[in-house]
A protein has these predicted regions:
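ATP-dependent helicase/translocase motor core
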Residues: 1-342, 351-366, 395, 405, ...
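Short glycine-/polar-rich loops that comprise or flank the Walker A/P-loop
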Residues: 146-148, 187-190, 340-341, 387, ...
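Catalytic P-loop NTPase motifs of RecA-like helicase/translocase cores
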Residues: 157, 423-424, 476
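Structural recognition of the conserved hydrophobic beta-strand(s) that form the central parallel beta-sheet
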Residues: 193-194, 390-393, 464-470
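Interdomain helical connector at the RecA1-RecA2 junction of SF1/SF2 helicase-like NTPases
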Residues: 229-232, 476-549
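Conserved helicase motor
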Residues: 347-350, 370-380, 394-399
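Conserved motor-coupling elements within RecA-like helicase/translocase cores
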Residues: 362, 376-390, 406-407
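Conserved RecA-like ASCE ATPase "motif II neighborhood" in helicase/translocase motors
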Residues: 387-419, 423-434, 441-456
Length: 549
C-alpha cells in the first residue's frame, strides 16, 4: 500500500524503517556528547565488546579522567583526519591502535562476520547538537558512536521542499557561526542530506551560503528527479536501499573519501603563483554508486568475455566512477580466486594516474597496486609483473590487445576505456591515428572510430572484459560495446549498460543547455546584413535583439 505522507511525518517513516527493517538502534539526543561531537557510550560499548585487551593495556576507561583523555584524542583525530579515515584505519591511543569499525566480511570468513555484527548502526531523531543554540537536526546517523550523516527533512504536504532544507543548512547550520557545533565542522561528519518526499540533495562540507549541494536522485525518463515509488514516497530508496547496513558499509569502505590535489593559485598580495593544496570530501552521487555496483555484479556473475557501454554525460563525475570501478574490480573473487588478474585503464589524461593512486591510497595501505605505463617497455614490464591496476595511454592500446590475447592469454583482464575527453583534446585522436597508420588525424573528433578500428582489426580477446565510458557513443560504438536487446520486429538494438544522460546533467545544472542561447543562421544573417547595409543602424540594439532570438 502506498504510504500516505499526509498522515505520517517523513521523519517517522525513515526512522521506523531503519529501526524495524534495517537493524539500526534508535538513539536519543542526550546520547550525543557535545564536547566531543560523538556518542561516547556507543564508542565505549563497541570497543569493550571487541578489543578488551587494548582497553586493559591502555587503561583508557578506568576513570573519568582517563576516559576524557581517550575521547579528547578520538575527537581530535576526527577533526584532523576525518570520520571515514578513522573508521577505515582506526586511531592510535598510547601504545594501541583501536579499530573503530569492522569491514564487510567475505563469505569464507565466519570470524569476520562475527566482528562485523558488533558494529553499532544508530539513527536518532531531533539531535540537539550545539552548546550555544537550541536548534536540532531532524535525523542523525552514527556508526559505533561516530557521526556519519545528518538529514533535514521536508515534505510537500506541509508546503516545504528540499530547497527549504538546503536553505536551512546554509543559513542555520553554518559551522563558522557556531564553533561548538562539532557535527557541522569539516571532515567530522561524512555527508549532510536535504530530503523531501520527491528529491534528495547532499553536501559533504557545510560552508554557509557557499555550501554546495549535489543531487542524489535516481533520475526519471532520462531527466532529473525520481520515479514513482510503489510505497508512495519517491525518496524511499534512501532508507530502503542506500542506508541498509551492507550498503552503507560498502559506501564507507569503497567510495567515501577525502582527496588532496595541488593547484597553482595567484597570491592576491604578491601577484605570484603559489601552490595550494585543495581538499575535497567525496560522497558518491546515486548514479555513480548504481553504475559501479551494477558493473561489479555483472562481472561477478558473468566472469570474463563481457562488454559494457557506460554512457555518462559530461558532469557525471566519470573520473571518480572509473577509479572506484578499477579499485573494486581487482578485489572481486570467485571463491578464493581473483576474477580479474589486472585492470588496465586506457586514457589520454595523465592526471587520471595520480587521481587513481590517491583515491586507492585513501582506502587501504596497498603498495604498488597502481602502475603508470607510458612506453611499450614499461607497459610490458607492468603486464608481466602482474600489476593489479595499469594506466596507459591510448596509442599503446594495440599492444595491449595483442599481449593479453597471446602471451598473457591465460590471465584475465578488465579494460576500462576512458573516452571522456575525446572531443576536447585533439592530441588523443592524433595519437590513435599514428598508432593505426602513422599519419596525423584529419578529423580530431574520431577517437571512437579509432578505438573501434583497433578492436575490430584484432578482434575482442575472450580473456578480457571491456568497460567503455563515453558521453555520446556513435552507432558503431553502441553496436560494439552495447547490450544487445531483441526488438518485437526481430531486429536487435544495442543499448548502454548504464546511463547518465545529457538531459539529466542539464536539468541538474552540471552542464549548460546550449539550445537556450543559440541564434539561428537566418537571424544572424538578417542582423549582419542589416548592419552592413545601413551605417545608421543601431548595432547595440541589433545585438540585443539577436540575443533574444
Amino acid at each position: 500500500m502506498p504510504t500516505d505522507i499526509s498522515e505520517k511525518e517523513l521523519e517517522t517513516i525513515l526512522v521506523s524503517y531503519l529501526r524495524d527493517h534495517q537493524g539500526y538502534e534508535e538513539g536519543v539526543s542526550s546520547d550525543y556528547n557535545k564536547e566531543f561531537g560523538l556518542n561516547t557510550e556507543r564508542v565505549k560499548r563497541f570497543i569493550l565488546s571487541t578489543q578488551k585487551e587494548k582497553v586493559e593495556n591502555t587503561a583508557c576507561f578506568t576513570s573519568p579522567t582517563e576516559e576524557h583523555k581517550f575521547f579528547s584524542r578520538l575527537s581530535a583525530a576526527l577533526s584532523k583526519r576525518g570520520v571515514t579515515d578513522v573508521l577505515r584505519k582506526g586511531f592510535k591511543y598510547i601504545s594501541e591502535i583501536f579499530d573503530m569499525y569492522y569491514p564487510t566480511p567475505s563469505a569464507l570468513n565466519p570470524t569476520a562476520q562475527q566482528y562485523y555484527d558488533k558494529n553499532i548502526f544508530c539513527v536518532t531523531r531531533q539531535l540537539y547538537y550545539s552548546k550555544e543554540k537550541t536548534d536540532s537536526i531532524d535525523v542523525y546517523i552514527s556508526l559505533n558512536g561516530l557521526p556519519i550523516m545528518t538529514m533535514e527533512l521536508k515534505n510537500h504536504y506541509t508546503g516545504q521542499t528540499v530547497e527549504n532544507a538546503i536553505k536551512q543548512y546554509k543559513e542555520d547550520r553554518d559551522p563558522k557561526a557556531d564553533p561548538t557545533a562539532l557535527i557541522l565542522q569539516k571532515r567530522r561528519c561524512a555527508v549532510h542530506f536535504a530530503v523531501d518526499d520527491d528529491d534528495i540533495m547532499m553536501c559533504t562540507e557545510l560552508k554557509g551560503n557557499a555550501s554546495w549541494f549535489l543531487p542524489f536522485n535516481k533520475g526519471v525518463n532520462g531527466g532529473a528527479g525520481n520515479p514513482v515509488s510503489p510505497n508512495g514516497v519517491r525518496t524511499a530508496y534512501l532508507w530502503e536501499e542506500v542506508l541498509g547496513k551492507r550498503s552503507l558499509s560498502d559506501i564507507l569502505e569503497n567510495y567515501a573519501q577525502i582527496t588532496f590535489k595541488e593547484k597553482e593559485v595567484k597570491n592576491k598580495k604578491t601577484g605570484k603563483k603559489e601552490k595550494k593544496t585543495i581538499e575535497s570530501i567525496i560522497w558518491p552521487r546515486y548514479h555513480q554508486l548504481d553504475c559501479v555496483r551494477q558493473l561489479l555484479k555483472a562481472t561477478r556473475e558473468g566472469g570474463v568475455g563481457q562488454k559494457f557501454l557506460i554512457q555518462h554525460s559530461a558532469g557525471s563525475g566519470k573520473s571518480n566512477s572509473i577509479t572506484w570501478l578499477a579499485y573494486q574490480l581487482v578485489g572481486l573473487l570467485d571463491g578464493t580466486t581473483p576474477i580479474l588478474d589486472t585492470v588496465i585503464v586506457v586514457t589520454d589524461r595523465v592526471n587520471l594516474d595520480t587521481q587513481i593512486r590517491d583515491n586507492i591510497n585513501s582506502f587501504k595501505r596497498l603498495s604498488n597496486l597502481v602502475d603508470w605505463a607510458d612506453s611499450s617497455q614499461t607497459l610490458e614490464d607492468a603486464l608481466q609483473d602482474g600489476k593489479k591496476i595499469i594506466i596507459t595511454i591510448v596509442h599503446k592500446f594495440p599492444y595491449i590487445l595483442e599481449a593479453i590475447g597471446s602471451e598473457l592469454k591465460n590471465k584475465h583482464f578488465g579494460i576500462i576505456i576512458d573516452e571522456a575527453h575525446s572531443s576536447q583534446n585533439g592530441s588523443l585522436s592524433a595519437k590513435m591515428n599514428i598508432a593505426l597508420s602513422g599519419n596525423v588525424a584529419k578529423n580530431e573528433d574520431d577517437l571512437e572510430d579509432k578505438l573501434n578500428a583497433i578492436i575490430e582489426g584484432r578482434k575482442m580477446v575472450k580473456n578480457a572484459n571491456y568497460y567503455a565510458f563515453t558521453a555520446t557513443p556513435k552507432p558503431k560504438t553502441l553496436q560494439m560495446f552495447g547490450t544487445p536487446c531483441p526488438q518485437p520486429d526481430g531486429k536487435v538494438q544495442h543499448l548502454p549498460f548504464h546511463e547518465y544522460t545529457m538531459k539529466q546533467a542539464i536539468e541538474e545544472g552540471f552542464i549548460m543547455d546550449v539550445l537556450k542561447n543559440y541564434t539561428t543562421y537566418a537571424s544572424f544573417y538578417k542582423v549582419i546584413k542589416t548592419v552592413n547595409g545601413d551605417p545608421e543602424f543601431d548595432q547595440k540594439e541589433a545585438h540585443t535583439g539577436m540575443k533574444t532570438k
